[in-house]
Amino acid sequence: MARWCGRLRRGVAIAAAAAAIGLPVAAGAVWGAVHGVAEVGPATVDVAVPHIPGSAPPSADEAPGLGPEVKRRLDAAVRGIMKEARVPGVTVGLWMPGKGTYVRAFGIADQHNGLPMAPDLYMRIGSETKTFTVTALLQLADRGRVALDDPIGKYVDGVPGGSRITLRQLAGMRSGLFNYSEDEAFFRALTSDPRRSFTPRQLLGYSFKHPALFPPGQKVDYSNTNLLLLGLVVEKAGGRPLGDYIRDNILRPAGLGHTLFPSDAAFPGPHAQGYTNQTASGEIENATDWNPSWAWAAGAMISDLRDLRVWARTVATGTLPDGTPLISRALQRQRLTVRPTAIPGAGYGLGVFDVNGWIGHNGSLPGYESLTVHLPSARATLVVLLNTDIDHGGQELSTRFGEAITKIATPGHVFSLRVRPTAG
């Protein structure tokens, strides 16, 4: 089964009986030997971010302030993971109203020329795209164009069991449909020509040839197939291409000028180079210019630190930076109603997870990982951006960084999506 993001075949158990499907994983020592990664100190950067109404601190919280000593501990934690896992570059932003701000860029953005990581770089954000696609769906529900309990067969033909699978179940990862990105033929097609373009219908074909994993609604099982279908629903009900709908109805109202839904492999600059071992040979390659069409509504989008800081709170609250609603309160409550997963402390709602109070999503696709979450109880926001998706010790690095940072900054609310070891 798939991870909590848009990866290819590597999987984790978020249901009790799930088994991992392995890809060759390059050891950390191999990365360092091949690419010569050295520990690089952080650059402290001030990032201009628009004021977010309602961001005053709560009256009390168990979290420490982000003073010099705490920042030194955070620096050490990030550097430690980078050294252990041979991470080329990472940018971290942590905003805690009334307690301080921590923004750091570590390491390098480009192995070829040694350019440093920086907070203003564009990055591919993988499955964080799901938060935008599901927000579009919820907007259309608010406008009476769709109903969450409609069957997917009302909008998309040819879906196995489409008369029984609802839009709500798709958004909540409870459809039972096979994850197309775990199909062997899809993996070969992508890695043999990673710059090729896929259509949503081509991708769905890789899923629909497999039997359903369970009856709709039975449990949470992460599948990128669900989001492809919801993307098609948004296009049909919204009357325009998915990227255009998201741009006009979400990005522009939220002021997210550095976030986009690319229609091809185009990547605005400046951006970090991304490194992956999700390749045909298992060797590390530069995946920066791989075509993200294979992930489409599940993971094709691009953003930066500034925009993701704003988006984190928007997703968690359902309101725009100026305080006006992006979706109705009723649908926001439904979005945040989570179902438990096999990972302790983690639940999944409609296109978002809640991990010990942190609400948001992570993302991963070849070359990049990200984490964008908001903690309403402390009005805190955490964004982590990496230019590699190579796991270490069977764990995604965005989770490793998120856990290490929140153990220090918000010890009462530790973010962890650590995967249980699985056989196979």
Predicted regions mapped to residue ranges:
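N-terminal export and membrane-targeting signals
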Residues: 1-19
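Catalytic loop of the DD-peptidase/beta-lactamase superfamily, centered on the K-T-G motif
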Residues: 2-5, 23-102, 238-240, 244-248, ...
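A generic alpha-helix surface/boundary motif
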Residues: 76, 134-135, 150, 228, ...
